[in-house]
A protein has these predicted regions:
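A short, Lys/Arg-rich alpha-helix, primarily the initiator
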Residues: 1-23
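Alpha-helical residues within the helix-turn-helix
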Residues: 22, 33, 62
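Residues within the helices of the helix-turn-helix
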Residues: 18, 29, 58
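Short, charged recognition helix plus adjacent turn
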Residues: 69-87
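DNA major-groove recognition helix of helix-turn-helix/homeodomain DNA-binding modules
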Residues: 53-71
Length: 87
């Protein structure tokens, strides 16, 4: 069950990070710098290979995310689907 939530979160964040980076016309290097992580770590998150840390997620919400509330609602909707499927 926990892995289902993690997979949904990873997929959502991968999409949002990539879309945001492209819309802001930032390189992976610049995104990594803003998020205080190395470029390889960012690239792995961007490709959906790795999950970001809590700090990285909060830095993204605070400094880069164009619609933080929308992102959180999307995560909640995905979590609700998982939760409802298990009841």
């Amino acid at each position: 069950m926990k892995e289902d939530y993690r997979a949904a979160l990873k997929k959502t964040l991968c999409t949002w990070l990539g879309t945001t980076r492209l819309s802001l016309e930032l390189t992976q290097d610049r995104m990594a710098e803003i998020l205080l992580i190395d470029v390889r770590s960012y690239a792995d998150i961007d490709r959906g290979i790795s999950m970001c840390s809590t700090l990285t997620f909060v830095l993204f919400l605070v400094y880069l995310c164009p619609e933080p509330v929308t992102l959180l609602k999307e995560i909640r909707a995905r979590f609700d689907i998982i939760r409802n499927g298990m009841e």
